[in-house]
Amino acid sequence: MSKYDDKKQLKCSFCGKSQEQVKRLIAGPGVYICDECIDLCSEIITDEFEENTQVDLSSLPKPSEIKNYLDDYVIGQDSAKKALAVAVYNHYKRINSDVDVDDVELQKSNILLLGPTGSGKTLLAQTLARLLNVPFAMADATTLTEAGYVGEDVENILLKLIQNADYDIEKAERGIIYIDEIDKIARKSENPSITRDVSGEGVQQALLKILEGTVASVPPQGGRKHPHQEFIQINTSNILFICGGAFDGLDKIIEKRTRKSSLGFGSTVQSKEEKDIGELLKESVPEDLLKFGLIPEFIGRLPIMVTLQSLDNSALVRILKEPKNALVKQYKKLLLMDNVELEFEDEALKAIADEAIERKTGARGLRSIIEETMRDIMFDIPSQFNIKKVIINKDTIKNKKPELVLTEDGEDRPEIVQTKHKRKSMDPETA
């Protein structure tokens, strides 16, 4: 302050206090600010920042609204939708809860989705994130390994979330992470092994702290950590983790536990096909997951178990035509862009569903079946202008030959037009 005139009384430009009344006065171009005003401004900014980082409960959909939204995109699985809706709603209420009021701290409840392949586990998680307008990241558990081994570190899961939040850490800390194929990191045997299981139990151990809530150090460019790089610090306490897996073989563990064996007259003989896999999974308990290969600590950090049912023929047919982004609607739109109408007969939809069940791919296999059926005709349509309608019937699913409705002008005119068009655009002498 020596460069200023001592005789001139300096005052804070905001509160008007003189330099004798405050501890420190900071000078700017023609203005001054005291330490008290700096502290006050800092408190205002901090309060506003904390308000912005909270999820507005008034705008947060109620559980019934969440389920109704899921109904638009996911067919069936009503019990799973209800469980997810309640869990997600409670999770974001927990984020906004004030521990200082009554000293009651709400613990985080991550979700474990169990269901056969193609039952809608991934779609449910994606649809939830879209509704809530929060950052969402998907990860594949099969690529994860314990730190120090070839593969991805578990922290790379958090990096995907940070990237999807445009590197807004506070926004990412309220996001949702879906870890698929979580059953693939089960340890190889029920009993602990003396050999190191770097892609099974080792990954489960590495995920424990992140699932529970910790301040994780994430490499900004991904990959392996090394001591000379800077890290992004992110608190996972308010990140909702949804883990999903098909858990092939878990049904046999449940069946073995629940099967009642009796001898002599009056014994009940149960066939293996008596219960659907989805029905068996509903009876799963933590003990079954332990025998499957998940460690107790990992099971404890996924307290909410949601079971999805296998999809039958009627459910798959509804999936084909009812959702807002149904496959039938998608392919109709694709052909309409070439001015061609597409019609799926009901028997064709049932045949597609039957083939998906036979392949044991669930809803995930529906697109590949339609793609195989439509491939040749979608190849021909842009070149053959006489096709105005394509009809997919039951026989089409078997022989891959759709029924075509042609224009009344005949087949020769489009070929002539097409030939002239090709010559004009491809002949180097006329170009």
From Swiss-Prot:
GO terms for cellular component: HslUV protease complex. Pfam families: AAA_2, ClpB_D2-small, zf-C4_ClpX. ATP binds at residues 116-123. Zn(2+) binds at residues 12, 15, 34, 37. Belongs to the ClpX chaperone family. Component of the ClpX-ClpP complex. Forms a hexameric ring that, in the presence of ATP, binds to fourteen ClpP subunits assembled into a disk-like structure with a central cavity, resembling the structure of eukaryotic proteasomes. This is ATP-dependent Clp protease ATP-binding subunit ClpX. It comes from Clostridium novyi (strain NT). The lineage of its organism: Bacteria, Bacillati, Bacillota, Clostridia, Eubacteriales. The gene is clpX.
